[in-house]
Amino acid sequence: NERLKRTLISSVGKLESIKRIADNEVSAMGERLRMLILTDYIKKENLAKIASAEEFNSVNIVSIFETIRRANLNVNIGVLSGSLVILPKAIDLSDVKHKKEDIANTDYCTVEFTGALHRGVDYVGKLFEEGKIQILIGTKSLLGEGWDSPCINSLILASFVGSFVLSNQMRGRAIRIDKNDPEKSANIWHLVTVEPEYLFKYKATERIYAYIKEDYKELHSYDYDILKRRFDSFMGPNYTMGTIESGIERITLIKPPYDKNGIERINEEMLKLSADRGEVKNKWRGEVADGSFA
């Protein structure tokens, strides 16, 4: 049913995936990392959970921020949205009108910029481009506020609602050419919740049968079904052949078995490949030059 689908799509387990990706990207890029994480909701009421032992039950700006902060990745994190801005206390804000409030027991503070919204958006964007923030978390509404930054070299799409056009717009944030870094290569991360088939059965007898006859050759995921449709219009190198193709089939690492160990294998291989940005650039350059499109 639709309620179950929404629950799976916004699975809190994705917070662990975001942390794992961030850790991997920090290890690969260090201070050169410019990671943007886009999501749907802010949830300011969760600010009270920061620097506490409380767990989160949904994916939103605050839960993503705190999950990464607790991981102690030795990077500066920022939050940018229409109603919530979080910045490291160490950043000098003396050249801009603002109000700020420290977040207890952390190195961060909430900031309220005085004046038009776009001024704060532009200011935080500049901090990001200058490397004073390595990981920036925001809502997809940023796309409608005139914010753009070609320095993005890692994008996590933790946004679970919206149209195909919006998905393309978000991807476009990462693939822009950066005149300050002509050799830039960006990773774009899509999060997928995979669940057993029996969860999608309506009758108890159907659920029991699906549980007993669990088939790990098939990938059961509402998330993945959406992603497959979107990948039909995304071009990229085939992971095995190297030719530039559309469709999710080009990501040849995604193969059965789709049990817990199989999914972990896929994730490990994805993380390993993502760290080699040079190889990604080589595949694009070689195949585009040769005209090897499929």
Say what each PLM segment does.
Residues 64, 151, 166-173, 226-230:
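Alpha-helical scaffold elements adjacent to nucleotide-binding pockets in ATP/GTP-utilizing enzyme cores
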Residues 84-89, 196-199, 249-254:
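A short acidic, often aromatic-flanked loop/helix-cap motif at beta-alpha or helix-coil junctions
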Residues 42-44, 84-85, 142-144, 161-163, ...:
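Conserved nucleotide-binding/hydrolysis micro-motifs of P-loop NTPases
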Residues 167-169, 173-224:
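Conserved segment of the helicase C-terminal RecA-like domain
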Residues 80-82, 191, 244-247:
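Conserved beta-strand termini and adjacent loop/short-helix elements that scaffold enzyme active sites
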Residues 205-294:
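Long, largely alpha-helical accessory region at the distal end of helicase-like NTP-driven motors
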Residues 137, 142-160, 169-171, 184-191:
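A short beta-strand element within the Helicase C-terminal
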Residues 1-135:
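Conserved C-terminal RecA-like helicase domain
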